[in-house]
Amino acid sequence: MKIQHVLTAASLVALSGLAQAQVDPLHVRSWAASCAACHGTDGRAQPGMISLAGVPKEVTIQKMLDYKAGRVPAATIMHQLAKGYSDEQIVAMAGYFAAQKK
């Protein structure tokens, strides 16, 4: 089962350039802005919260897919939020946050 998760993430990363090229950057910024309440503006969180800025795209993609699929214990609302995004949106947002300075 773990291999399937890795293959899924690898496939999404491979397609990420294509996905980002097809997604309007303003849409990506808008989706990413919805993360600001918890993760800070452009992913730079306050102490005590997880920062997304500068996190490798592959890491964020895998984590979001894990939340979306219910593979992460429901300690936060992330499992519900992740279900609201398509895989392509997740890839685009992961690329956005990876490009932000820590």
For every predicted segment, state its role.
Residues 13-32, 48-50, 66, 101:
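Electrostatic cytochrome c docking/interface patches
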Residues 1-8:
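Bacterial N-terminal signal peptides that target proteins for export
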Residues 28, 42-71, 80-85:
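Gly/Gly-Pro-rich "capping" loops immediately C-terminal to redox-active cysteine motifs
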Residues 44, 73, 100-102:
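Inter-heme linker and motif-flanking segments adjacent to c-type heme-binding CXXCH motifs
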Residues 83-102:
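C-terminal capping alpha-helices of c-type cytochrome domains
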